[in-house]
UniProtKB/Swiss-Prot annotation:
InterPro entries: Glyco_hydro_14, Glyco_hydro_14_CS, Glyco_hydro_14B_pln, Glycoside_hydrolase_SF. This is Beta-amylase 1, chloroplastic. Changing C440S: Normal redox inactivation under oxidizing conditions. Changing C454S: Normal redox inactivation under oxidizing conditions. The gene is BAM1. It comes from Arabidopsis thaliana. It catalyses: Hydrolysis of (1->4)-alpha-D-glucosidic linkages in polysaccharides so as to remove successive maltose units from the non-reducing ends of the chains. Its main location: plastid. Transmembrane segments: none annotated. The modification Phosphoserine is found at S55, S59. Disruption phenotype: Normal growth rate and starch breakdown in leaves during the night. Changing C73S: Impaired redox inactivation under oxidizing conditions.
């Protein structure tokens, strides 16, 4: 799951991809910029490519992230004299994403610890897990989010799946009446903010990457990133005779077959991992070994031989074969800022030239095609199983106020001052009835470094408008752990989706919010009281007229009554 400072992605708006089987030619269909339409509202349409064509590129400047969830929102009871609250909340299947009848509130899920299942395929800290889940249930949360790690389940050999600890953990959730968002985590754990443990890719996959290093994402300096298999190899039988996409599909099919009895009742959502930190993006800002530090612009990740082969073919199809040998090498280094570089600078930057449009269109379309392939498999595998499919998009809010939006571009989201990079993603998800899950919901613009022109609130607003236009449900997560009322208030505000363009005032809220994360800090008395009040307020929805003080008084009484249970959870997790 996404743990980074906050990531989001975007993509290009090229020719729509037909759902179903992808072909090699679909990777190469890049039309000249004049043949593509500009994006929807809120974006400047006076686009003109100008400035010098950076071809040949300059040398780099070195510098210092249900078909129907009908049961996803059941009633919960608060015992010990506090009364019972009945709320029926459901994910919306289609239409205007997240729209509900009468503003019925936003269900809250809580992310489980990354190491909830051990490397030995058992439940980690079993006693702590049970006490913690009981506490969460008593607080009124809808359910939990669990990483189902590829590197744990299919660790030993291809096609051999050990569901060990997951069987026990999911049965415990069922027993307690908690719903589950299961994340198909095809990435490595370790190397991102908040990654407290290391869970590598399956050993047999690592062996194949060792034999063929080009299976790893690669930057222009030859640095390899092993968090996730390069999308350039998606359709090649490079993993013991199977393609990466086939491996992901086989894993999801095995999960479905093993947990069929829980799908639709306990397991209500399948979040499909599509990149580093489980997000649909390139690993453009890797934090391992200090390669990238916030708020650097990151670097393009398309220099493995498979991606370069696709770029070469795309350039030939476009009629500019000289553009096919490399990506822009004047785009700076990981920790540069946009104005440090020729490619991303405001005036005359290569991003705003014909070459820049060609490259960024190809780069972002490769990411869209990757998502389309995996979603097509997921949709067919989980069809009629009563679960909703979701995809996580990173909240990349730094340098959002610049013209080029450099960090979004290197991550694969073709989002600039003149182009909406999130609508194409939303449209792709809409074709598969999937949920658009977005991070950095808790952040406010003024909390972030203003010299880096960070704007998480404006970014969330843009994404909300894109999902509204595409009629796709929007869900949210906080990017960093927060326990304060100020962050909770921002989440409440963002989840209400109060947009000026909101279809004549029709009620629309996020379909769900997932809170990062369950840990000892959450169960500290002060934090727990604020969290309980937050969950209550989220459940009441936008139409609630109760003041926060009233909700907090209820929460205080609740915390007092359930104190022994919460203390047990805190102590057990600490040890």
């Amino acid at each position: 799951m996404a743990l980074n400072l906050s990531h989001q992605l975007g993509v290009l708006a090229g020719t729509p991809i037909k759902s179903g089987e992808m072909t090699d030619s679909s990777l190469l269909s890049i039309s000249p910029p004049s043949a593509r339409m500009m994006t929807p509202k809120a974006m400047n349409r006076n686009y003109k490519a100008h400035g010098t064509d950076p071809s040949p590129p300059m040398s780099p400047i070195l510098g210092a992230t249900r078909a129907d969830l009908s049961v996803a929102c059941k009633a919960f009871a608060v015992e010990n004299g506090i009364g019972t609250i009945e709320e029926q909340r459901t994910y919306r299947e289609g239409g205007i994403g997240g729209k509900k009848e009468g503003g019925g509130g936003v269900p809250v899920f809580v992310m489980m610890p990354l190491d909830s299942v051990t490397m030995g395929n058992t439940v980690n800290r079993r006693k702590a897990m049970k006490a913690s889940l009981q506490a969460l249930k008593s607080a009124g949360v809808e359910g939990i989010m669990i990483d189902v790690w590829w590197g744990l389940v299919e660790k030993e050999s291809p096609g051999t799946y050990n569901w060990g600890g997951y069987n026990e953990l999911l049965e415990l959730a069922k027993k307690l009446g908690l719903k589950v968002q299961a994340v198909m985590s095809f990435h490595q754990c370790g190397g991102n903010v908040g990654d407290s443990v290391t869970i590598p890719l399956p050993q047999w996959v690592v062996e194949e990457v060792d034999k063929d290093p080009d299976l790893a994402y690669t930057d222009q300096w030859g640095r390899r990133n092993h968090e996730y298999i390069s999308l350039g190899a998606d359709t090649l039988p490079v993993l013991k005779g199977r393609t990466p996409v086939q491996c992901y599909a086989d894993f999801m099919r095995a999960f479905r077959d093993n947990f069929k009895h829980l799908l639709g009742e306990t397991i209500v959502e399948i979040q499909v991992g599509m990149g580093p930190a489980g997000e649909l993006r390139y690993p453009s800002y890797p934090e391992q070994e200090g390669t990238w530090k916030f708020p650097g612009i990151g670097a393009f990740q398309c220099y493995d031989k498979y991606s370069l082969s696709s770029l070469k073919a795309a350039a030939e199809t476009y009629g500019k074969p000289e553009w096919g040998s490399t990506g822009p090498t004047d785009a700076g280094h990981y920790n540069n800022w946009p104005e440090d570089t020729q490619f991303f600078k405001k005036e005359g930057g290569g991003w705003n030239s014909e070459y820049g449009d060609f490259f960024l269109s190809w780069y972002s379309q490769m990411l869209l095609d990757h998502g389309e392939r995996i979603l097509s498999s997921a949709k067919s595998i989980f069809e009629n199983m009563g679960v909703k499919i979701s995809v996580k998009i990173a909240g990349i809010h730094w340098h959002y106020g610049t013209r080029s939006h450099a960090p979004e571009l290197t991550a694969g989201y073709y989002n600039t001052r003149f182009r909406d990079g999130y609508l194409p993603i939303a449209q792709m998800l809409a074709r598969h009835n999937a949920i658009f899950n977005f991070t950095c919901i808790e952040m406010r613009d003024h909390e972030q470094p203003q010299d880096a022109l960070c704007a998480p609130e404006k970014l969330v607003n843009q994404v909300a408008l894109a999902t509204l236009a595409a009629e796709v449900p929007l869900a949210g997560e906080n990017a960093l752990p927060r326990y304060d009322d100020y962050a909770h208030e921002q989440i409440l505000k963002a989840s209400a989706l109060n947009l000026d363009q909101n279809n004549e005032g029709e009620p629309r809220e996020m379909c769900a919010f997932t809170y990062l994360r369950m840990n000892p800090e959450l169960f500290q008395a002060d934090n727990w009281g604020k969290f309980v009040a937050f969950v209550k307020k989220m459940g009441e929805g936008r139409d609630s007229h109760r003041c926060r003080e009233e909700v907090e008084r209820e929460a205080e009484h609740f915390v007092h009554v359930t104190q022994p249970l919460v203390q047990e959870a805190a102590v057990a997790l600490t040890h």
